Amino acid sequence: MQEWFQNLFAATLGLGDLGITVGLVVSVIVKIVIILIPLILTVAYLTYFERKVIGFMQLRVGPNVTGPRGLIQPFADVFKLLFKEVTRPKLSNKALFYIGPIMSLAPSFAAWAVIPFNEEWVLTNINIGLLYILMITSLSVYGVIIAGWASNSKYSFLGAMRASAQSISYEIAMSAALVCVVMVSGSMNFSDIVAAQAKGIAGGSVFSWNWLPLFPIFIVYLISAVAETNRAPFDVAEGESEIVAGHHVEYSGFAFALFFLAEYIFMILIAALTSLMFLGGWLSPFPQSWGIVGTPSAFWMFVKMAAVLYWYLWIRATFPRYRYDQIMRLGWKVLIPIGFAYIVVLGVWMISPLNLWK
């Protein structure tokens, strides 16, 4: 695509060297649009799917009025949010009040720049893709803190403090889990990490993926991922029964929609990251000798992401909310020690004769 645009602007339109630069910029913009539009549509229908799944588990119907089987409900919700008035508390900080939602949403979009869907479908294939993801996603906590403080509300500020403390705490446990994957893969490039999962004793099958030899740390990662995205049962940052709606209690209309969009995009990002790091990415769960079913494809990447997202919804419909002190105790006294201990265990394992990743 990049070469096509560069040839178009340089040769066809006669812009020369300037056309090469313009073609590069245009190709990047087109790639960004190709990623963001399906992502936003996925968020819209993920909300619909969430309400349907939870309704089914609670013996309800879920959305069924707007359109056939309620399929147009996400668009009705979008129009409602777009046309609602964006109110602001009188004593709030106007500039920071509007910067908060933007700072929460921007990192969730920027993180997708390095997420590959197969060996070719990636915006930017860099060797420190995992480090970039950890760095860019950690910035979203600033948007939460700014929104909570700028609202000039005790409920918003308390929710922001809870959300930021929880996010920072579980980021440590999640990072420890991802360090284990880097150790066995020998790279922070997502394509290399996926390729490494096709090797080993059980190479070419579901049993060679990282979830099996790293199963204890895989569980630590999954729990940390739910807490990192402030989803149930770790959603104390917006506990309706305690602090109304957390850091975005004073937001309405389009400003609230930005927080909402950021939360669900982070969910999808975690699903993609889980697929790449532990579930083989675009690798097929079947041996390649099975023909087209065993061929690596972006289809398998999307299937695994959908499975992780369904797991998110199942967790929300099943488990009650934790108390805040229980969440912090689980993170600091259980998950973080397990994460660091497993790094040591894995290091010893890899230098022993029982190394599975040779």
Swiss-Prot record:
Q: How does it assemble?
A: NDH-1 is composed of 14 different subunits. Subunits NuoA, H, J, K, L, M, N constitute the membrane sector of the complex.
What is the official name of this protein in its record? Answer: NADH-quinone oxidoreductase subunit H
Q: Name one Pfam family in it.
A: NADHdh
Q: Which reaction does it catalyse?
A: a quinone + NADH + 5 H(+)(in) = a quinol + NAD(+) + 4 H(+)(out)
Tell me which GO cellular component terms the UniProt record holds: plasma membrane
Question: What residues form the membrane-spanning segments?
Answer: 20-40, 95-115, 128-148, 168-188, 206-226, 253-273, 295-315, 334-354
Protein purpose: NDH-1 shuttles electrons from NADH, via FMN and iron-sulfur (Fe-S) centers, to quinones in the respiratory chain. The immediate electron acceptor for the enzyme in this species is believed to be ubiquinone. Couples the redox reaction to proton translocation (for every two electrons transferred, four hydrogen ions are translocated across the cytoplasmic membrane), and thus conserves the redox energy in a proton gradient. This subunit may bind ubiquinone.
Q: Where in the cell is it found?
A: Cell inner membrane
PANTHER family attached to this UniProt entry: NADH DEHYDROGENASE SUBUNIT 1, NADH-UBIQUINONE OXIDOREDUCTASE CHAIN 1
Q: How does it sit in the membrane?
A: Multi-pass membrane protein
Q: Which gene encodes it?
A: nuoH
Q: What is the lineage of its organism?
A: Bacteria, Pseudomonadati, Pseudomonadota, Betaproteobacteria, Neisseriales
Example GO biological process term?
Answer: aerobic respiration
GO MF annotation, one: NADH dehydrogenase activity
- Keywords, comma-separated and alphabetical: Cell inner membrane, Cell membrane, Membrane, NAD, Quinone, Translocase, Transmembrane, Transmembrane helix, Ubiquinone
Q: What is its EC number?
A: 7.1.1.-
Q: What is its main location?
A: membrane
Q: Which family does it belong to?
A: Belongs to the complex I subunit 1 family.
Spell out the InterPro entries in the cross-references: NADH_UbQ_OxRdtase_su1/FPO, NADH_UbQ_OxRdtase_su1_CS
